[in-house]
Amino acid sequence: MVESDSSGIVRHSQGEFDIVQVYKKFLQDDPEITMPVAAIEALVQLLSRSQAKTISEFMDILQNGSNTLKEGVQNNISLSAGCDIFQRFVTRSLHDVGDFEQCKRHLVENGKLFIQRARACRQRIAHLGYPLIRDGSVILTHGFSRGVAAVLLAAAKRHVRFKVFVTESRPSGSGCLMTRTLKNACIPTCMVLDSAVSFTMNRVDLVLVGAEGVVENGGLINQIGTFQLAVFAKHAHKPFYAVAESHKFVRMFPLSQYDIPFSRPILEFDDPSPETVHPEPEPIPTPSDAIHNELIMNEEQIRNNPTLDVTPPEFVSGLITDLGIIDSKSGVSEELIKLYL
């Protein structure tokens, strides 16, 4: 019997395994690891410690581990993609099983090989994507993305001269990390307010963003603000490319922004009744602390806002992936068909 609970514990006949804690430790120990790869690492570790005696028990452990991860982690879009692809990989490997113990060892070893290949995706993406960065061009990117950084750093190493606008990317402020990464590589950068994107767009030659997930119709799920970049880019006739590893292709088909599964209610109106006392909340630190700190949103207000948005495929010029630069409208569905059929 295999069980799991909301605390992140997978319970099976051989004991307990805190898969959410293991997943978080992988992310903490390796800043370069992506969420789906960390999820696959945690699942491989779960399977390697299991003493399952049958295929059914083995698959139950894997299924419960995946479900526990999805339920125990907020913003689990890319994590879910990694779990689903790894489950499909394991299912395919179970055909024509002879000796189960030998098969189990083979699966764990192949799982580790799967991780190695997933980790190598970013290098291939950088190699495929850097030719899009032309000499003398100006790039606009949104916050921090390891994939986007890899493409830009690959271009810089080949002595391509370019400049980068980086959005601050509130509320995370991850644009600060991207700016620091690019400056360390001697790439000229300028951080811009999220609200200044439309003002900046006419000076831009190419928009390059990352993705938390790429959905079935080729649309993107990414940090909030990505869609507005895409809208402004399309209006200004600027190419808009997204960088994403193929293990971020996710079996979802959101029809609107509200189809993204958030872990809590968002955009709730507060209670303006005179009976309700609203104490003045403490402002939280942000990159804008030096300017009118008393006017920034507090933590409660930030939590009431979405962290992700959906960019429809018609706004995406192409996807830079480890499988090549593919058309967002047809390429993703074709690759998902190959994976799941």
Curated annotation (Swiss-Prot):
Family matches, as InterPro entries: eIF2B_alpha/beta/delta, elF-2B_alpha_N, IF-2B-related, IF_2B-like_C, NagB/RpiA_transferase-like
Name of this chain's protein: Translation initiation factor eIF2B subunit alpha
The entry's keywords: Cytoplasm, Initiation factor, Protein biosynthesis
UniProt-annotated location(s): Cytoplasm, Cytosol
MF annotations from Gene Ontology: guanyl-nucleotide exchange factor activity; translation initiation factor activity
Outcome following mutation: residue 57 to K: Increases guanyl-nucleotide exchange factor activity on eIF2
GO cellular component, one term: eukaryotic translation initiation factor 2B complex
Its biological purpose: Acts as a component of the translation initiation factor 2B (eIF2B) complex, which catalyzes the exchange of GDP for GTP on the eukaryotic initiation factor 2 (eIF2) complex gamma subunit. Its guanine nucleotide exchange factor activity is repressed when bound to eIF2 complex phosphorylated on the alpha subunit, thereby limiting the amount of methionyl-initiator methionine tRNA available to the ribosome and consequently global translation is repressed.
Family of this protein: Belongs to the eIF-2B alpha/beta/delta subunits family.
Complexes and interactors: Component of the translation initiation factor 2B (eIF2B) complex which is a heterodecamer of two sets of five different subunits: alpha, beta, gamma, delta and epsilon. Subunits alpha, beta and delta comprise a regulatory subcomplex and subunits epsilon and gamma comprise a catalytic subcomplex. Within the complex, the hexameric regulatory complex resides at the center, with the two heterodimeric catalytic subcomplexes bound on opposite sides.
Keyword Cytoplasm recorded: yes
Keyword Protein biosynthesis: yes
Effect in UniProt of substituting residue 253 to V: Decreases the amount of gcn3 in the eIF2B complex
One GO-annotated biological process of the protein: translational initiation
Origin organism lineage: Eukaryota, Fungi, Dikarya, Ascomycota, Taphrinomycotina
Superkingdom to which the source organism belongs: Eukaryota
Any matching Pfam family: IF-2B
SUPFAM superfamilies in UniProt: NagB/RpiA/CoA transferase-like
